[in-house]
Amino acid sequence: MNVLDNFIKIKNSINSLSNTVKIIVVSKTFDINIINPIIKYGHNHFGENKVQEATIKWQPIISRYPSLKLHLIGNLQSNKAKDAVRLFNYIHSLSSEKLANILMKEENLINKKLKYFVQVNFSNLKERNGIKPNEATSFIKYCINDLKLEIIGLMCIPPLNENPNSYFFELKKIAIENNLHELSMGMSNDYLDALKNGSTYVRIGSKIFGERTNQ
């Protein structure tokens, strides 16, 4: 498994469509030794699902690579917010007023500003994380105006086994309505569709590292 070759191939294919799209290499469950070739190649954006795993993996090497940008792309529990603010630069799963308030307080405690994506949930499943589409605008305004969080864009994960294009289109529509310019959409199986719909951040893991044996 040559992860660097896989990454460069994907990077070149994406750059042929747009050279402004940021590729988040989703390195969850993989050891830092496997990720290292991509770091040494000069890539900066990496994504993780779990705060505890990410802290163990990245904390020892962050000081050696000051340009690294770490993205939390998984669901964030309130009791992990403190550690998340200290480690990550971006959070893609902002989805409740309670969490937003906690993150604001943690930012203020250490005088650090993160960049946030509001996660929009187009599924009717309650266990799916995210704000309902019809509640997105009021939530975005609350986070920006009341809490002074730096909301840069929106994120979504389309429902499984459905054509993602309509969901990507709808997410872009909500972003435009709220004057947000960044869209975190598209993973290994649908990033080309996401790019056609204006994605600015794609989250790619299995196309680079192969299928995970554990989640």
Q: What does each model-identified segment do?
A:
Residues 1-182, 187-189, 195-197, 211:
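Conserved alpha/beta-domain cores
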Residues 195-215:
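Short, basic/aromatic-enriched C-terminal tail that caps enzymatic domains
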